[in-house]
């Protein structure tokens, strides 16, 4: 039996640039990504400094496209004591990929990141949290591709993503004829449903008191929690891309408040990497990380 003296809180960052978000995918082709001014290095550096202020260590799910163009960023994240994990290569949702295509991205991104950071990469997060009932096959692919945990399941019901029947707390779940550790994104009960909190737009757009209350809900009940943010979400000065009113509001609203909310949430507990928390919860073997091999 595990006796905890504090809740298992983790913090994660999906390292992608502002022009790579799913909401813009129908308007900005991947072939044009290189024509946009990149802001991911400076924004990630700001998050690293913010984490240092809070004495927090985090898991950085780095997009392969970003790693190829900014290899020094991956090395710097690792050198500051944070976990490097995979966010795929092209930011295509798993629902858009065949099993073979997904396997190729999973392997390519893992090897790329391991080569850059000099440590094993064992964690994965799908773009737009796109592991759902129809894409559970991806978990078996991840296990076969050398990963030990996933953090893609959002146990909510949304149009583009969500797996309402998925786990609401970290667990080992089926991955073909084996299993894999899963650290789901955070939600709180709201009647018969689950309400998303503390991740991406939900951290930024919901009233601050809701985010703080959600974190306190987890803390008081000692429910494991992973907070998630993107580097572009702390950048109110990023270029404005002209799309639909809803897409623009969802992307650009309240970018000037994300860092303040993060600071307040991070004061509620000691935040560490997803890998560390899964090991503490005995969902991964309690062994030290080794160099890539």
Task: Annotate each PLM feature.
Residues 2-83:
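Active-site beta->alpha N-cap acidic-glycine motif
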Residues 2-3, 119-122, 126-228:
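Active-site-adjacent pocket scaffolds in enzyme catalytic domains
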Residues 12-15, 85, 125, 228:
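Generic enzyme active-site microenvironment
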Residues 18-23, 191-193, 236-241:
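Short acidic/His/Gly/Ser-rich catalytic and metal-binding motifs that mark active-site loops
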Residues 30-38, 61-63, 90-102, 127-130, ...:
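The substrate-binding groove and active-site-proximal loops of carbohydrate-active enzymes
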Residues 44-48, 71-75, 103-110, 139, ...:
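Generic structural signal for well-ordered alpha-helices
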Residues 54, 205-293:
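C-terminal domain-boundary segment and adjacent tail
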Residues 54-135, 147, 152-159, 178, ...:
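Metal-dependent polysaccharide deacetylase catalytic core of the NodB/CE4 family, i.e.
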């Amino acid at each position: 039996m595990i006796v905890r003296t504090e809740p298992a809180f983790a913090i994660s960052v999906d390292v992608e640039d502002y022009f790579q978000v799913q909401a813009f995918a129908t308007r900005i082709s991947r072939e044009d990504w290189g024509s946009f001014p990149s802001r991911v290095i400076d924004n990630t550096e700001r998050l690293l400094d913010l984490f240092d202020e809070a004495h927090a260590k985090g898991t950085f799910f780095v997009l392969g496209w970003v790693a190829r163009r900014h290899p020094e960023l991956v090395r710097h994240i690792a050198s500051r004591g944070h976990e490097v994990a995979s966010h795929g290569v092209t930011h295509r949702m798993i629902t858009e990929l065949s099993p073979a295509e997904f396997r190729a991205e999973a392997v390519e991104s893992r090897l790329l990141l391991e080569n850059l950071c000099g440590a094993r990469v064992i964690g994965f997060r799908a773009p737009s949290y796109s592991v759902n009932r129809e894409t559970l096959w991806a978990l078996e692919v991840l296990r076969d591709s050398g990963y030990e945990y996933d953090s893609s399941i959002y146990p909510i019901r949304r149009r583009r993503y969500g797996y309402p029947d998925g786990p609401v707390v970290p667990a080992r779940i089926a991955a073909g004829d084996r299993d894999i550790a899963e650290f789901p994104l955070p939600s709180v009960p709201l009647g018969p449903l689950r309400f998303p909190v503390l991740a991406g737009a939900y951290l930024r757009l919901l009233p601050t008191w809701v985010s703080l209350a959600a974190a306190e809900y987890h803390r008081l009940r000692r429910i494991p929690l992973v907070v998630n943010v993107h580097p572009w979400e702390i950048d109110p000065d990023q270029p404005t891309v002209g799309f639909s009113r809803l897409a623009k509001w969802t992307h650009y609203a309240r970018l000037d408040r994300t860092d303040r909310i993060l600071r307040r949430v991070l004061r509620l507990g000691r935040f560490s990497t997803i890998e560390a928390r899964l090991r503490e919860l005995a969902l991964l073997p309690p062994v030290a990380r080794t160099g890539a091999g």
